Amino acid sequence: PMDTYSYSASKAGVHHLTRAMARRLGPEHITVNAIAPGPFESKMMAATLKAAGDSIARMAPLGRIGRPDDMAGVAVYLASRAGAYVTGAVIPVDGGIETTS
């Protein structure tokens, strides 16, 4: 397995920054949120998915790898009126993988 210390630390930093900026910018009626993607079809994940895509998909309760339209739906929600009262949230879009760790 590959060590992911620096990657994990950078993601934790993004999560903290999201909450801190939401608190700071909320009085200006500015929402700040983050999307935390799990494994998705992408150039970055291509080699990993080729080597282990089936086993990664089995880890997700939804049983598959994320697709671009899965991510787009969350982004549209946050950018729309429907997400106007959501701030400081880190939304996992991972097929439920977060629930298994």
Roles of regions detected by a PLM:
Residues 23-27, 84:
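Alpha-helical segment proximal to the catalytic Tyr-Lys
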Residues 60-71, 82:
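A conserved structural motif in NAD(P)-dependent oxidoreductases
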Residues 3, 7, 15, 90:
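Catalytic tyrosine of NAD(P)H-dependent dehydrogenase/reductases that use a Tyr as the general acid/base
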Residues 10, 18:
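Active-site helix of classical SDR
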Residues 76, 87-101:
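Short C-terminal tail/terminal secondary-structure segment
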Residues 31-41, 79, 92-94:
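Conserved SDR Rossmann-fold cofactor-binding beta-strand/turn motif
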Residues 1-6, 20, 29:
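Conserved catalytic loop/helix region of short-chain dehydrogenase/reductase
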Residues 2-3, 27, 37-60, 70, ...:
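A glycine/serine/threonine-rich, flexible loop-to-helix segment
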